[in-house]
């Protein structure tokens, strides 16, 4: 635990990021399947699967943190970690559009685009999602939530996130 200048103990961003990772590891792994790509209108259709069963994208229409993997989740496969204040589904979709080279002129997702440029295929992307409502208790924390995904990304050694200095 970190200590303030007044001698009070608190949980730092780094320590809280570790708690998020542990909570996220308990979540199911989802597979993303690209149903179609329409280059004319710059659209994409996605389906999500868990244990071979199709699941609704509505599960991810809420705030939370998500981690995308190439192939199955593992130490060397972590592509990107993101956090959404509204809909994780929208952010996952934007990453996939960047990966499929299907972004409109008014859309960007640097990590998705960079992953495509480094040869990552959209055909075997998996992810884990932790809804904000399931985040660990923030009692006794002094957090900067704006950068929490970067702290998690740094611990997971993602390939396409900006990294925070430790």
Please place each PLM-identified region on the residue numbering.
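Boundary/linker segments flanking structured domains
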Residues: 1-79, 83-166
């Amino acid at each position: 635990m970190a200590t303030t200048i007044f001698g009070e103990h608190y949980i730092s961003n780094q320590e809280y990021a570790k708690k998020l990772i542990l909570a996220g590891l308990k979540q199911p792994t989802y597979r993303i399947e690209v149903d179609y790509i329409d280059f004319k209108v710059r659209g994409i259709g996605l389906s999500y699967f868990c244990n071979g069963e199709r699941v609704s994208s509505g599960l991810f229409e809420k705030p939370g943190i998500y981690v995308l993997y190439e192939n199955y989740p593992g130490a060397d496969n972590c592509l990107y970690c993101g956090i959404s204040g509204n809909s994780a589904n929208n952010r996952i979709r934007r990453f996939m559009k960047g990966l499929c080279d299907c972004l409109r002129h008014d859309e960007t997702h640097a990590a998705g685009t960079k992953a495509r440029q480094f040869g990552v295929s959209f055909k075997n992307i998996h992810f884990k999602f932790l809804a904000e409502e399931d985040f660990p208790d923030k009692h006794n924390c002094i957090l900067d939530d704006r950068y929490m995904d970067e702290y998690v990304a740094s611990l997971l050694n993602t390939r396409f996130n900006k990294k925070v200095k430790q």
